[in-house]
């Protein structure tokens, strides 16, 4: 399938991210990968005095109902084949290479390759969905977990260690602007490079799971994919720090 590139300069004209695009003193984004799932389990910014983790802990320590299956970069889709629908998840890798910079998942005939690299101070993530089977497969309801640490445990913690994640699900111009609740820098941004984000979903939020004190688990939704045997679809974004 053809790839849709999303030029960086085009995105610089988008409302809230205009300031981000012209920032020239970005601080490096650091991350660690869960060796069991291949998901990103922490994301920090160099020289942040608070050493804030921009992601919810997925080991049950922050919320007992949020576990490793919600790690950053894991996800789900509904497979449609021969008029049958099955909801499937990728959460256990077939292989992890380069300390989590190259992770492969296999779910039925679908291979999901996650590649991570640094470009200057920014983190680039690329997701490739490939049909390794012998039949046409339609993927719908596709979501990638992006568990931003958007919740409200107490005033001091919120000011220093939590984010408001502002999501613009603007197709090929989508972005997330994660602002520290205290309003002071550094902050975190995510901008789409390739593909589209159509919408987002919230999981693990209800009356018995934090109610209004947590945003829940955010997943970004991709458009449906029709993959013939051997076809692939590529989707990517970059993550960077900014001053607000």
What residue ranges belong to the model's regions?
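Beta-strand-rich recognition/accessory modules
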Residues: 27-37, 104-108, 117-120, 142-151, ...
């Amino acid at each position: 399938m053809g790839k849709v590139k999303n030029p960086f300069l085009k995105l610089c004209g988008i409302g809230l991210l205009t300031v981000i695009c012209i920032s020239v003193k970005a601080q490096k984004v650091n991350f660690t990968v869960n060796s069991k799932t291949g998901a990103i389990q922490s994301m920090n910014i160099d020289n942040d005095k608070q050493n804030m983790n921009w992601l919810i802990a997925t080991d049950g320590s922050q919320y007992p109902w949020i576990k490793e299956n919600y790690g950053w970069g894991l996800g789900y889709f509904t497979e449609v084949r021969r008029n049958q629908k099955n909801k499937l998840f990728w959460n256990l890798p077939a292989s992890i290479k380069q300390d989590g910079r190259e992770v492969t998942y296999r779910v039925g005939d679908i291979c999901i390759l996650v590649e991570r690299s640094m470009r200057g101070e920014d983190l680039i993530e690329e997701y490739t969905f490939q049909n390794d089977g012998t039949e046409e497969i339609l993927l719908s309801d596709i979501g990638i977990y992006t568990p931003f640490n958007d919740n409200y445990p107490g005033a001091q913690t919120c000011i220093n260690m939590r984010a408001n994640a502002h999501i613009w699900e603007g197709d090929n111009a989508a972005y997330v602007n994660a602002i520290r609740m205290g309003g002071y820098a550094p902050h975190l941004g995510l901008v789409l490079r390739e593909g589209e984000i159509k919408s987002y979903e919230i999981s693990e939020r209800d009356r018995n799971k934090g109610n209004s004190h947590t945003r829940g688990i955010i997943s970004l939704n991709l458009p449906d994919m029709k993959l013939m045997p051997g076809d692939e679809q590529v989707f990517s974004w970059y993550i960077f720090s900014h001053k607000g």
